[in-house]
């Protein structure tokens, strides 16, 4: 019996839609359960090309839940090059905490930028 992996997906605002949707499609096609967490103070985010979408939750809700997932996937976007300007925002502090938590639990942490 093969157990399905469960993945937490982080999406910045704005996110690279092509990258995000490729991840989500691959997970869907392979029967891998996932939840998308917005790296923002709200669930509603956008893609680099202006498409609006609603994530399952925000990154704040992912804190303390690394044991619920096998992997953390970071989906990059135009928000990352200007990260330094917003590094002190609560959602970016939550992002760093979540990455640290997943790494500390020896979870797979992957992404693209």
Per-segment meaning from a language model:
Residues 1-105:
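Extended, subdomain-level signal for the structured scaffold at the beginning of enzyme domains
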Residues 108:
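Short glycine-centered segments of the SAM/dcSAM-binding site in methyltransferase folds
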Residues 111-113:
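Catalytic nucleophile serine of serine hydrolases
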């Amino acid at each position: 019996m093969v157990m399905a992996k469960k993945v937490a997906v982080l999406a910045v605002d704005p996110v690279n839609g092509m990258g995000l949707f490729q991840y989500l499609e691959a997970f869907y096609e392979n029967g891998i359960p996932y939840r998308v967490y917005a790296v923002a103070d709200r669930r509603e985010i956008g893609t680099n090309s202006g498409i609006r979408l609603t994530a399952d939750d925000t990154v704040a809700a992912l804190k303390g839940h690394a044991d619920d997932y096998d992997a953390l996937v970071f989906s990059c976007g135009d928000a990352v090059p200007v990260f330094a300007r917003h590094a002190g925002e609560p959602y970016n502090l939550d992002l760093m905490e979540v990455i640290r938590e997943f790494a500390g639990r020896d979870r797979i942490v992957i992404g693209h930028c």
